[in-house]
Amino acid sequence: MGVKSFVEGGIASVIAGCSTHPLDLIKVRLQLHGEAPSTTTVTLLRPALAFPNSSPAAFLETTSSVPKVGPISLGINIVKSEGAAALFSGVSATLLRQTLYSTTRMGLYEVLKNKWTDPESGKLNLSRKIGAGLVAGGIGAAVGNPADVAMVRMQADGRLPLAQRRNYAGVGDAIRSMVKGEGVTSLWRGSALTINRAMIVTAAQLASYDQFKEGILENGVMNDGLGTHVVASFAAGFVASVASNPVDVIKTRVMNMKVGAYDGAWDCAVKTVKAEGAMALYKGFVPTVCRQGPFTVVLFVTLEQVRKLLRDF
């Protein structure tokens, strides 16, 4: 069961991640919308996750207001200004991220779930499911953080002025450029946030899916089939979205920032709330739900089918 659970989770995660990539890109762009790009006022700050002796770097702040934009209009604008292919910017990083991060978290969750299940009743209570999700999500995020940073930057590149774009050729080029220009530690920029978010998402998503599915089956609402998998997975996606969105906004901004933009995650959160209001932490919530819902549905429906195919192995 050990290795097979990783294979099953990896296949399902890659399919789900790549098929919902455009929704994730729109979510990232919305989370960055309103963030200060540049101006003439220079402030000296240390980069996020900087070491104590790090030297400060200049950051250009802005006070200009930015009009609100919705996910549909943003998607249309991306297609008009950058072309339809832009909706798949960073998909190579998504592929790598799902291979590293999701394969690890999905496989490890199943391993822990099986290990912690009561041998007599054959059941696992909700608190242990959440614990398994927290552990699996944290380890998976630590493994996949370099691909996560590359993915965010590649997705966000099109919103920058032409002169400021990074123009990465692919995930390999993105990682090489970051290491060369910003050091190896840049690959783990925002890693504390990534790990926190992954722990929340994995615990909320996987534990709630199992809980919703068990509740539906035990109460005889539906049989164990496609309908049950879709309902349980969409509900799990909504729970994960509500729980993770604030951390996701800060994570996205820290990962995408130019050197010196924020003095760490807390500084990013404070500046975001101060400049844009508390609800800025739920920027991109609609596309988060619109992405997390389909992603979770595809993830678990695919996972259930892959399990059937690999049942005899």
From Swiss-Prot:
<dbReference type="InterPro" id="IPR023395">
    <property type="entry name" value="Mt_carrier_dom_sf"/>
</dbReference>
<feature type="repeat" description="Solcar 1">
    <location>
        <begin position="4"/>
        <end position="115"/>
    </location>
</feature>
<keyword id="KW-0812">Transmembrane</keyword>
<dbReference type="InterPro" id="IPR002067">
    <property type="entry name" value="Mit_carrier"/>
</dbReference>
<feature type="repeat" description="Solcar 3">
    <location>
        <begin position="224"/>
        <end position="309"/>
    </location>
</feature>
<dbReference type="Pfam" id="PF00153">
    <property type="entry name" value="Mito_carr"/>
</dbReference>
<keyword id="KW-0813">Transport</keyword>
<comment type="similarity">
    <text>Belongs to the mitochondrial carrier (TC 2.A.29) family.</text>
</comment>
<dbReference type="GO" id="GO:0006839">
    <property type="term" value="P:mitochondrial transport"/>
</dbReference>
<dbReference type="GO" id="GO:0005743">
    <property type="term" value="C:mitochondrial inner membrane"/>
</dbReference>
<feature type="repeat" description="Solcar 2">
    <location>
        <begin position="124"/>
        <end position="215"/>
    </location>
</feature>
<dbReference type="GO" id="GO:0005310">
    <property type="term" value="F:dicarboxylic acid transmembrane transporter activity"/>
</dbReference>
<dbReference type="InterPro" id="IPR018108">
    <property type="entry name" value="Mitochondrial_sb/sol_carrier"/>
</dbReference>
<comment type="function">
    <text>PUMPS are mitochondrial transporter proteins that create proton leaks across the inner mitochondrial membrane, thus uncoupling oxidative phosphorylation. This leads to a decrease in the efficiency of oxidative phosphorylation and an increase in heat production. May be involved in protecting plant cells against oxidative stress damage. Recombinant PUMP4, reconstituted into liposomes, transports a wide range of dicarboxylic acids including malate, oxaloacetate and succinate as well as phosphate, sulfate and thiosulfate.</text>
</comment>
<feature type="transmembrane region" description="Helical; Name=2">
    <location>
        <begin position="84"/>
        <end position="104"/>
    </location>
</feature>
<feature type="transmembrane region" description="Helical; Name=3">
    <location>
        <begin position="130"/>
        <end position="150"/>
    </location>
</feature>
<keyword id="KW-0999">Mitochondrion inner membrane</keyword>
<keyword id="KW-0677">Repeat</keyword>
<keyword id="KW-1133">Transmembrane helix</keyword>
<feature type="transmembrane region" description="Helical; Name=6">
    <location>
        <begin position="282"/>
        <end position="302"/>
    </location>
</feature>
<feature type="transmembrane region" description="Helical; Name=4">
    <location>
        <begin position="189"/>
        <end position="209"/>
    </location>
</feature>
<feature type="transmembrane region" description="Helical; Name=5">
    <location>
        <begin position="230"/>
        <end position="250"/>
    </location>
</feature>
<feature type="transmembrane region" description="Helical; Name=1">
    <location>
        <begin position="6"/>
        <end position="26"/>
    </location>
</feature>
<dbReference type="GO" id="GO:0071456">
    <property type="term" value="P:cellular response to hypoxia"/>
</dbReference>
<protein>
    <recommendedName>
        <fullName>Mitochondrial uncoupling protein 4</fullName>
    </recommendedName>
</protein>
<keyword id="KW-0346">Stress response</keyword>
<keyword id="KW-0496">Mitochondrion</keyword>
<keyword id="KW-0472">Membrane</keyword>
<dbReference type="InterPro" id="IPR050391">
    <property type="entry name" value="Mito_Metabolite_Transporter"/>
</dbReference>
